A protein has these predicted regions:
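Glycine-rich tight-turn/loop motif centered on a GG-T
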Residues: 95, 132-143
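Active-site groove signature of glycoside hydrolases
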Residues: 112-134, 160-169
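Residues at structural and domain junctions
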Residues: 56, 87, 132, 139, ...
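Acidic/histidine-rich catalytic cores of soluble enzymes
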Residues: 14-19, 37, 44, 147-195
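Short, small-residue-enriched loops and turns at beta-alpha junctions
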Residues: 88-92, 127-128, 170-174
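N-terminal pre-domain/capping segments
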Residues: 1-118, 141, 151, 158
């Protein structure tokens, strides 16, 4: 296209390619990391419960020592953790479930900062406890609920030096890129710790 320069080979060599580690064949974590390295990836998206079955991944297990262990096995395979995934419903209408989900996000943010992962990735939930699609997910009310429940998560992320990145999914509240931008603009979340 006119006006666009072609990427130089030197610049393209600097780009780090990553993979969602749960897309690699099911195997112990160390084996998955070796496969990712062999395939030429430099970083990975780590969704703890989707990737690690040989160690606990509950909130109490996300300790500094565990983070250091994971950093070492990633480094041994010349990989970084680019994104720590946390996929829970921040619009859950059950107050106890919502509180548990929020606590889990805070634990993941803290763990991401220890891992050296600058991003915690998430989806945007549903207006029901089952985390399933219904038309109300795309309502103005649902968007307000999501933004309100996201604020303390983003505030904590800012304190921990971590970015919360949302992934629009059609079945969820934020269902496309333009709505994600609208949610960001319309909220008071002007921090750079939310994308």
């Amino acid at each position: 296209m006119a006006g666009q320069e072609k990427e130089s080979p030197e610049r393209m060599e600097k780009m780090q390619l990553g993979i969602r580690l749960h897309d690699i064949k099911k195997a112990p974590l160390e084996e998955r990391l070796a496969i990712a390295h062999e395939q030429g990836f430099a970083c990975g998206h780590l969704a703890l419960a989707k990737v690690i079955s040989e160690y606990p991944v509950d909130d109490g297990a996300l300790t500094p020592g565990y983070a250091m262990y994971l950093k070492k096995i990633f480094a041994a395979n010349q990989l970084d953790v680019a994104v720590l995934g946390c996929y829970l419903n921040l619009a859950n209408p059950n107050p106890a479930s919502l509180a548990k989900n929020t606590h889990r996000y805070l634990a993941h943010i803290r763990f991401a900062s220890l891992l050296g992962a600058g991003v915690v990735g998430t989806e945007t939930g549903a207006v029901n406890e089952e985390y399933r699609f219904e038309e109300r997910n795309h309502s103005e009310e649902a968007l307000k609920i999501f933004i309100n429940n996201l604020r303390p998560v983003v505030s904590y992320a800012e304190k921990m030096g971590v970015i919360v990145a949302i992934e629009p999914v059609y079945k969820h509240i934020v269902c496309n890129p333009s709505q994600a931008e609208q949610a960001h603009v319309r909220s008071s979340l002007t921090t750079t710790h939310w994308i």
